[in-house]
Structure formats: C-alpha cells, structure tokens
Amino acid sequence: MVTKNNLMRSILSIIALFSCCTLAAQEYIPTYGREPMRGELLVYPSAREAAEADGSDNKYFKHLNEWTQKGNSFTTDFTVPFAWANRQVLFRLGWASADYEIRVNGEAVAYNSDCNAPAEFNLTRHAKEGRNTLEVILSSPSKVERLESWKNDASPAIGAAWVMSQPTLRIRDILTKTWRSTEEGDNVMAEVGLVVKSEALNPRTSRVHYELLSPAGKTSATGYKDIKLNMRGEDTLRF
C-alpha cells in the first residue's frame, strides 16, 4: 500500500533528480572556433613529396608528440617559422577523453563539445612567428555524468595532434566518388571534388592543377581548372 507520505517523497525525489539534470545542462558550453569538419588532409611542399605520402614531418607539417600533462591540462610548444608567413596555421586534434578548450599563448581561442571526433582549429590570428604555447584543457566531469552515460570515468587523455600551414587560398576538403561503368568498357570511374577556400580580403582568381595517381603510382589523369572566389569565399571544383 502506497501512503500519501511515501508518494510525496517519491515525487520530491524525482523533482530533485530532474533539477540536478537541469543544472548540469545549464553548464553546457557550445562549440566555437572550430573549422568545418573534413577528412584527414596532409600538406606537402612539393608534388613529389605528396606522391610519397609517408605522413612524416615536413616544411609545412609538424606532429605534436611531446605534451606536458598537469591534471586535465595538456601543454606543448610549436614554432611558426618564417616560411609560414602570409599562410594559414591550422591545429588538428584526433580526439580527447572529454570536451576541451584550446588556448594559444594563454588566450582561449576555441572550444569543442564533440570530443570523440577529429577537429581542426585555425590559429592564424592567435599564433605569432617563432615559439608559441598551445594548451588543451579538458572539461571536468559533470556531477551527474553517471546518469548521462554508462561509461566509467576516463583518465584525461588526448589523441594524435599536429600543426600545419596552408596558403591563403587553400584546399579545405577533398570529396571522392568511384563506380564501375559498363558504358566505358567496364572501367572503374572516379569523380573528385576539391573544396577550395579563400581567406583573402579581396576577390581572387586562381588556377588549380591536379594529378590523379593509381594505387600503383601511375598517372591516371592530369589537368587544371580555374576558380574565382570572392572575399573569404568557398566553392567546389569537380574533375
């Protein structure tokens, strides 16, 4: 038999539970300062090095392997060389064990509330030529985290990370589509889309050269296309 007092206690417990959840929800920080999602894209100084594609450090690409951890904070240094002048400085982090804030030289520049997916951040306006300090600060666990997820508390951790430099007019993403065409002699066909982004403050017309290589390293197609972008514009070239 349920008494009136027991029923009231149950109702008050439910109200208290939802109040805790509401307070936790109010602590949510939305993502800001993150680049649009894209596939993994590496930068090489020359077509020859790009064809080798071994993923090692080069003139415009540096892995960040040495981090100093203090609690929920991971800190490292990176250098912006003179060769990166008038170019974009991008930071990519593969994953983290919690949502995180990005700080450059002590300044908060971005926040990512989707810690499980790779994310990129444009640090161009915040990094200076020479040595810079980069900090990834993981958020503290929510007080009602156990109510929100079945996962156990994870130790603070971050995934693979690197910084790279791209030109002011850059390839932001690469989209591919392949299919087998019986109309073309049972050949495998491919369509490639290059998402081109301009960070310039004035309209620009540029020519994009391309070379498609087969898995065996042989040239399958070459050519170029012209593209005109307005101030900080973006468009897709299809080959």
Which positions does each model-derived feature cover?
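Bacterial Sec-dependent N-terminal signal peptides
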Residues: 1-27
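Hydrophobic alpha-helical membrane-insertion signals
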Residues: 26-68
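Accessory beta-strand-rich segments of carbohydrate-active enzymes
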Residues: 27-42, 70-173, 198-199
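Solvent-exposed strand-loop boundary residues in beta-sheet-rich modules
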Residues: 47, 106-108, 167, 214-218
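Solvent-exposed, conformationally flexible loop/turn segments
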Residues: 71, 129-130, 185-187, 230-234
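Short, solvent-exposed loop/linker segments at the N-terminal edge
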Residues: 178-188
